[in-house]
């Protein structure tokens, strides 16, 4: 059964966050969520209960750093940035995802197999 609209596939949240920060540079949590929603054409929505624990976990692993700043609407916000270690992890996770997507594509195209 496919995940309900808006849910991130299990195991892809770190990849999505790392890639978003790699593409756009420092962003606050709301900015990350908005960008993911925009790029996915509203298919994926990162809620606070999912996103902020992930950001904390990524920071604890040394893949991102955070720093307080002021948002466009003059509010205090924590901005997250990708680290060198985070870029390496992004490359690893991207390669793993591409391998798995290839396997799934082959399985879906294997009509009559089995």
Residue ranges and their predicted role:
Residues 82-86:
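Accessory beta->alpha helical hairpin/"wing" motif in late/C-terminal subdomains of nucleic-acid enzymes
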Residues 3-6, 68-69:
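Short beta-strand/turn micro-motifs at beta-sheet edges
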């Amino acid at each position: 059964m496919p995940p309900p609209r808006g849910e991130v596939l299990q195991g892809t949240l770190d990849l999505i966050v790392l890639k978003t920060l790699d593409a756009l540079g420092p962003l606050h949590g709301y900015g990350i969520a908005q960008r993911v929603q925009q790029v996915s054409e509203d298919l994926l929505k990162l809620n606070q209960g999912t996103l902020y624990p992930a950001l904390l976990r990524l920071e604890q692993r040394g893949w991102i750093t955070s720093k307080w700043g002021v948002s466009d609407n003059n509010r205090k916000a924590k901005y997250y940035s990708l680290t060198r270690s985070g870029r390496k992890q992004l490359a690893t996770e991207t390669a793993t995802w591409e391998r798995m997507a290839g396997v799934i594509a082959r399985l879906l195209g294997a009509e009559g197999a089995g």
